[in-house]
Regions:
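Active-site signature of alpha/beta-hydrolase-fold catalytic machinery across serine-
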Residues: 67, 151-155
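Short beta-strand scaffold positions
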Residues: 55-56, 123, 143-144
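Short, solvent-exposed loop/turn segments at secondary-structure junctions
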Residues: 11-13, 59-60, 83-84, 146-149, ...
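Generic beta-sheet signal
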Residues: 4, 138-146
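Acidic, low-complexity terminal tails and accessory targeting/binding regions
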Residues: 1-2, 44, 77, 85-96, ...
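Glycine-rich phosphate-binding loop signature in dinucleotide/nucleotide-binding domains
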Residues: 46-49, 132-138
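Active-site-proximal alpha-helix that buttresses catalytic centers in soluble enzyme cores
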Residues: 2-72, 101, 114
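Phosphate-handling substructures
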Residues: 28-29, 71-125, 165-166, 187
């Protein structure tokens, strides 16, 4: 990989309602507004050479990629390591309730009901980015979720993670060069090795 274009999926029906939806087996299509956002992303990418498109397992990332790359023969790879978190009992409820729990909890704590600890989520994202940077394709479009992008941007900025992060804008592109992605991986792994958050 030489460069990666990181994009949060377009607005989904559930994200428009502020719901926590991390399970891949729960359908969550784009809203009408999200479809328009994905089309606009496609217009922005129309003249950009893309050698591989990576999505998470979740429907909203795949649908965003399908619309944005319509008519283009871009190979696909589904990478579960870049899925949204598993929220446990907060799944399907207001995201704000999960965030309130996270703010009061240690980063190693698992949400009740089978959710993922934030440390485990960060480790998973680091592994996902490591797989991407090892790919032979030069330009990779990564359609994923707000959290892995937010963590990547924090890492590049040299800041520490926090339980409450601003949402990344829908269908907005962030271009990271190879060295940037390697720095992200290094920092994410360091966060997990010596968690102070």
């Amino acid at each position: 990989m030489q460069s990666a274009i990181l994009v949060r999926h377009a607005e989904s029906v559930f994200s428009a309602l502020g719901l926590a939806t991390g399970r891949a087996d729960v359908g969550c299509p784009l809203s009408d507004r999200g479809v328009a956002q994905a089309r606009a992303l496609g217009d922005e990418l129309a003249k950009k050479g893309i050698d591989l498109c990576v999505t998470s397992e979740l429907e909203r990332t795949k649908q965003t990629a399908d619309i944005a790359l319509a008519g283009r023969a871009v190979p696909r790879l589904v990478l579960a390591a870049l899925n949204d978190p598993l929220y446990g009992r907060y799944e399907g409820g207001p995201l704000a309730e999960y965030v309130a729990w996270a703010v009061e909890s240690d980063s190693a704590a698992e949400p009740p009901g089978g959710g993922e600890a934030r440390q485990a989520i960060v480790a998973r994202y680091a592994a996902g980015f490591r797989r991407i940077v090892a790919r032979p394709e030069r330009v990779i479009l990564l359609v994923t979720h707000s959290l892995p992008i937010a963590y990547a941007l924090l890492a590049l900025d040299g800041r520490e993670p926090a339980p409450r992060l601003p949402q990344v804008e829908y269908a907005k592109r962030y271009v990271l060069e190879r060295d940037d992605v390697i720095e992200v991986i290094t920092r994410l792994e360091a966060w997990c090795a010596a968690p102070t958050w």
